[in-house]
């Protein structure tokens, strides 16, 4: 996993929103594109190449933050591919949601990035705890909207 702190970006109100984002994709090119997006948006991010690694990073980062009161979620957003080896994105999402519940953490916003476009796939993702469902190829503008950008 790679951590890259970047400078916060100012919102129009003058306040700073500097979200932490977990980028998850087993495809090196797709992951690199997500990193480019994160850098352009001045996001603080971590990378994972499968759902298990993503869940382990999420847990590890949460435990580092466990001294805060109330406990804070380790990431504001997770951009999660769904079709990955070791552990798929839906299983990882379920584990993250269970962990958040167990630890009393505020839920992060999980965005599915997938080539699976059927209505059933979208229902399965929603039931697993996915907040936003984007079908590949995904444009940077679509991801930016999730972060509140235009």
Q: What is the role of each PLM region?
A:
Residues 1-150:
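C-terminal compact regulatory domains
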């Amino acid at each position: 996993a790679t951590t890259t702190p970047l400078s916060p970006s100012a919102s129009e109100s003058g306040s700073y929103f500097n979200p932490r984002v977990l980028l998850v994709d087993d495809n090196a090119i797709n992951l690199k594109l997500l990193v480019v997006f994160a850098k352009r948006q001045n996001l603080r991010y971590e990378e994972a190449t499968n759902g298990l690694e993503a869940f382990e990073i999420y847990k590890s980062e949460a435990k580092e933050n466990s001294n805060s009161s109330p406990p804070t979620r380790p990431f504001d957003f997770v951009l999660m591919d769904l079709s990955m080896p070791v552990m798929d994105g839906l299983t990882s999402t379920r584990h993250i949601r269970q962990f958040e519940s167990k630890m009393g953490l505020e839920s992060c916003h999980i965005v599915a990035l997938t080539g699976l476009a059927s209505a059933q796939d979208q229902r399965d993702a929603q039931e697993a705890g996915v907040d936003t469902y984007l079908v590949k190829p995904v444009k940077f503008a679509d991801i930016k909207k999730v972060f509140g950008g235009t």
